[in-house]
Amino acid sequence: MKIYKVDKTLVSTNRIAMMEHKPLLVVREKDGGTPQVAVDPVGCKPGDWVICCGSSAARDATGVKGYPSDLTIVGIIDKWEVPQDADTTS
């Protein structure tokens, strides 16, 4: 599992049927980091710090075996101090 920050929502209305209508979010490991798409089954909003899992754990976390995801949000962090030496510039 890794910690990410939610950057913004991602709108994709035309999807394969298996993806259903689960929300998709753009997340980054740090400000200015590479954007990644994560499935959001927990209800996050931009600016939230979240815990994500990847690989087969990401598929299992959606609740649908074989779901086409390699990054899924599994929790919203209530309180977390960003380390002082972390690059948080945008």
UniProtKB/Swiss-Prot annotation:
The keyword Lipid biosynthesis does not apply. Residues 1-78 form the BMV domain. Its main location: other. Keywords: Bacterial microcompartment, Carbon dioxide fixation, Carboxysome. InterPro entries: CsoS4A (IPR014076), EutN_CcmL (IPR004992), EutN_CcmL_sf (IPR036677). Induction: Induced by growth in low levels of dissolved inorganic carbon (at protein level). Pfam families: EutN_CcmL (PF03319). GO terms for cellular component: carboxysome. One of its GO terms (biological process) is carbon fixation. It is found in: Carboxysome. PROSITE patterns: BMV. PANTHER family: BACTERIAL MICROCOMPARTMENT SHELL VERTEX PROTEIN EUTN, ETHANOLAMINE UTILIZATION PROTEIN EUTN. Belongs to the CcmL/EutN family. CsoS4 subfamily. Homopentamer. NCBIfam families: carboxysome_A. Probably forms vertices in the carboxysome, a polyhedral inclusion where RuBisCO (ribulose bisphosphate carboxylase, cbbL-cbbS) is sequestered. Has been modeled to induce curvature upon insertion into an otherwise flat hexagonal layer of major carboxysome subunits. The tight homopentamer forms a pore with an opening of about 3.5 Angstroms in diameter which is positively charged. This is Carboxysome shell vertex protein CsoS4A. It comes from Hydrogenovibrio crunogenus (strain DSM 25203 / XCL-2). The gene is csoS4A.
